[in-house]
Each structure stands twice: as C-alpha cells, then as structure tokens.
Amino acid sequence: MEEFQGYLELDIFRQHDFLYPLIFREYSYALGHGHGLNRYMLLENIGYDNKSSLLIVKRLITTMYQQNYLIISANDSKQNPFFGYNKNLHSKILSEGFAIIVEIPFYLRLISSLEGAEIVRFYNLRSIHSIFPFLEEKFPHLNYSADILIPYPAHLEILVQTLRYRVKDASYLHLLRFFLHEYSNCNSLIITNKSISIFSKSNPRFFLFLYNSYICEYESIFLFLRNQSSHLRLTSSGVLFERLCLYRKIEHFAEVFANDFPVIPCFLKDPFMHYVRYQGKSILASKDTPLLMNKWKSYLVNLWQCHFDVWSHAASIRINQLSKHSLDFLSYFSSVRRNPAVVRNQMLENSFLLNNAPNKLDTIVPIIPLIGSLAKAKFCNAVGHPISKLTRADLSDFEIINRFLHICRNLSHYYSGSSKKKNMYRIKYILRLSCVKTLARKHKSTARAFLKRVDSEFFQEFFTEEGGFISLIFPRASFALRRLYSGRVWYLDIIFINGLSNHE
C-alpha cells in the first residue's frame, strides 16, 4: 500500500476523507483485482476491445441507478448484450473497488498510530503453537467456558451505520448503501447463512472488510464493558484492537448503555474473564461460578439484539465445565484434567503422605474430525479404513512416498503437543497403509505382494518414528529424549493450520 500512497494522491483527500472521486479512478479497481482488471473484465465481456476504459466503470454505476434494472429477469439478461457475459460481474467489480478504496482511511490511521511507537517484534509469537504455553499456565485455573457463535447482521443498514463512524464521505456511503441494497434485492444475499457464504466466496475482500468492521464495532463495546466491570485493566495490543475515537464516544456509549443495559451489577468484578475470538466464534472462560457466565451471556445477547438488531437466543449459548467438556480450539480438544500425585513428606521422625491433585491442560487430537478430513481427501473411507489414492501415472514411487511422508510429518509436527499419542499413531497408520495401497495399485498388485517384492529399506524413512530419529542421533541420551518426545512439544515455526487439521 505504501507504493500506491502517492499514486492515489491521498494528500488531497486526507483532510476530509473525500473518497468518492477515487471510485472513478481505474487504478483503484486494478489494485482491487491484483492488477488483473483487464484480464478479468474483458475476457468475460464479449464486444469490448483489449483496453479497459473509465466508461466501463461509469456505465456500471449508471446501470445500478436505472430503475428498470431492478426488475430485469434471467431471460432479459440473456437478451441484453451488456448483461450477457456475467450477471454478477458488475457487482463483483464494484465491490472489490469499494473494498480497496474504503481501506485507505484505515490504513492511514494505522500508519499514523504506529508513528513514534516502538513495537518489539517477536517472530516466534507468529506461531500458532505460541498460544498453548499461555493456555498451559492460565487454562488449569479456569472452571467454565462458553462457545458462542457470533451472529451476523441480516439488515444491510447496520453495516453502513457501522462504517459511518469511520468514513466521513457522505457521497461514498450513499453509493455503498445503494450498492448493498441493490445487490441484496437482485441476488437475495446477506440475508441467510447460505447467502452469506455465497457472498463471502464471490466477494471475499469486500465481505471480510464488512465483517471485520462489524466485529470491531461489537468488540469495542464488549471490551469497554469488560474494562468497566473489572478490577484489572485489559491487557491487549493497541494495533489489534485499534478503535477510532473510542474515548470520544464514551459519552455516547453511556447513553446507549443507559437504554440497553439499565443496571450493571457491581459484583461483576472478575479479573479472570478471558475472551478469545476464533473462526467466527467468541470463547469466554472464567474462574468463577456459572452465575457470572450467565450474566455475561445475557449482556452479549442484549448487546446484539438492542444495539445491532441481530437476533440471538440465550438458550443456544451453552456454558460448559472445563473438567467435563472439551473446547475445540486450534484443531485441538482442550480441557482441564486433574493430575493426582502423592507426595511423601518427612518432618523429624514423622512422615506422612499428601494427596495433591492439581489441574492440568489436556490437549487431545480430534480423531473423528481428522478421520473425516482424511476420508474427504480420499485417504480412507468414512470409518477410517485406508484406501488407495488416485495419483498421476507419471509420478515415480519415491515421489508418491515423499508426498505421503510430507503430509504425515506435517500432521505429526502440528499435533506434537497432544497429551495422548495413540490417536496420532492411528492417523499415521492410515497414511502409511494408504501409501502402500496406492503404490500397489500403480504396480497392479496387492499390498501384501508389493511389500514382499520391494526392499525393506524402501519404506525405512517413512516407517521410522520421530522418536527413532532422536535415538539414532543421540544414542546415549535416548532415554531422556524419548521421555521428552513422549510429552508435549510446541513448535514455534507453525504459522498456519494444516489443511487436514482445519475441520472447522
């Protein structure tokens, strides 16, 4: 974005956030399409030459304002040469242009907030596994959790009103409002969960921007409530939870809270309330009794219903005890398990035994969802029996083995923090036997006959466990390292969830 800051002539629009003229700049849409506007628009639109023109963008906007367009049927679109290429093409082009333009003020505010601020970068914290050492320390002290699905607003005006706090250009907001309403009327989008999924796939950048704006507005109010009801101030990053003019809006918030939340009980002083947002869900965890969790659940439901006009039912939010229920987080089933231990104490001539049972974080591999992912990828059937996988005929045996080996190592690497290794052994067994059946199918043989025919060293690397590698490298310290390997190991080089592990 830095390289286009001067190109977009942002100095002219910085003072008043005047974004409307940028809609008629062709390079705005080129940026939105990743410099592929000509290829995308002209290949599907028969009748235009190989040069994009500003008239195309103007015609798209003009067409939106035509009254007869709202009643164009599918048959009319086939007869109309302008709509003959793709009936959603103009909406997709404008949505991506809207997204790249409306991100400009947010980017400038982010840059201004970072100026003069010395932020230490810890690259190891980019790893997904870096959150689990924190959970090992905090999670055993928590008792209850609530897994809440964040509802998405069905009314389009809520999305526009959310942007009003940040974007000051009235002309741009009017065009954005008209575009959203026109798009929903013609395609019935942003009304149901299915339509939201379609909208997110057809306009990913625009959908993510609207969704993040809504989530940011919701979390700003929720975190404000949390700070006001807690003895301890919230520890968070200013960049992650950056809010525009938050303290200027405190007076307005006070009026909203007075209407929507008549009473905030003084006993809601919980320094152990933890909040996490993960894949469209809010996770609340607390140390206190279920009464506090029920109070916060009611506040969230009232916040969505009264402030965002989003329907959410309190009965759909379940509060679970962590010692009895697992929490699905980052493709692990995490729970609190009591770890009983007997300690023998000696005091002078007297000795006695102490029973100590501290809580411990228990992380388990989600075996059933993982087998479902393997079955979807054609490594096994629905019950977990390995099957041969279709491969290209020109692949050599070593290339096939390396592909299976790469998948097996990635899964083993990601689930190295599991408390129980038996589930991971079953996943490795499925992948190994699937590899053997794939090779046997390629050579038109059975798995047993193929294993007898090949050399034993052929699968040596594939069938060697990670613990075997450690014992080969460090034979004298193999006992200690094997004990370390049998425990949880968190790696600091994992920056994304494996595709097979991401079963959400």
Swiss-Prot record:
Name under which the protein is recorded: Maturase K
UniProt GO MF annotations: RNA binding
Gene expressing this chain: matK
PANTHER family: MATURASE K (PTHR34811:SF1)
Domain of life assignment: Eukaryota
Cellular compartments per GO CC: chloroplast
Membrane-spanning segments: none
GO BP terms in the entry: mRNA processing; RNA splicing; tRNA processing
Location within or outside the cell: Plastid, Chloroplast
Family under the similarity heading: Belongs to the intron maturase 2 family. MatK subfamily.
One Pfam family here: MatK_N
Keyword terms, alphabetized: Chloroplast, mRNA processing, Plastid, RNA-binding, tRNA processing
Function recorded in the entry: Usually encoded in the trnK tRNA gene intron. Probably assists in splicing its own and other chloroplast group II introns.
InterPro entries: Domain_X, Maturase_MatK, Maturase_MatK_N
